C-alpha cells in the first residue's frame, strides 16, 4: 500500500467535495473552485468528512497513480482553503519589477522591459521593487508561472545575479584567479 495514498484527506468545514462516476473531482471552498480529472484506475470515495483513495489492483501503474491522486486531491483542498504563493527575488543592478494593472513589468538587463500577463487564477504582488509574489489556488499553476518568470534570468553561480526563489540557495563558484 502506498504510504501517502492510504492516508485519508480531511475535508474542512466550508469545503464541498464531489466526484463524478468518471473520476472528475470538484472542490469548492472560500477561495474558489478547482476541477481536475483523475485516473480511471483509482477509486475515490467520501466517508464522513474525509476522502479515501484506493486502487483496484497492484499493478505498477496503479501503485504509482495511488499516491499521486491522493496528493493532487490534498493540494486541491489546501488550495481552496488557504491558497498557495511563491516569492521570487530579483538580484542584480537595475533589476526591478512593477505592476501595471494585471501585468508584471520587469527590467532584467535586456534592451526592453519583460512584460508578463497574469494568467486566470494567478495574481501578482510586488511588495518591494525586487520582490514578486505569485498567488493562486492551483499549486501547479502557481509553480509553473513562477518557473516561467524565473526562466527569464536564472541565477548565475559567479555573482548570484538573476531571479531566484526566496528560499533557494545558489551554489557559488570561484572566479578565475588569473596569471601570477
From Swiss-Prot:
GO terms for biological process: cytoplasmic translation. The keyword rRNA-binding applies. The keyword S-adenosyl-L-methionine does not apply. It holds the Pfam family Ribosomal_L6. Keywords: Ribonucleoprotein, Ribosomal protein, RNA-binding, rRNA-binding. GO terms for molecular function: rRNA binding; structural constituent of ribosome. GO terms for cellular component: cytosolic large ribosomal subunit. HAMAP family: Ribosomal_uL6_B. This protein binds to the 23S rRNA, and is important in its secondary structure. It is located near the subunit interface in the base of the L7/L12 stalk, and near the tRNA binding site of the peptidyltransferase center. Belongs to the universal ribosomal protein uL6 family. Part of the 50S ribosomal subunit. This is Large ribosomal subunit protein uL6. It comes from Clostridium kluyveri (strain ATCC 8527 / DSM 555 / NBRC 12016 / NCIMB 10680 / K1).
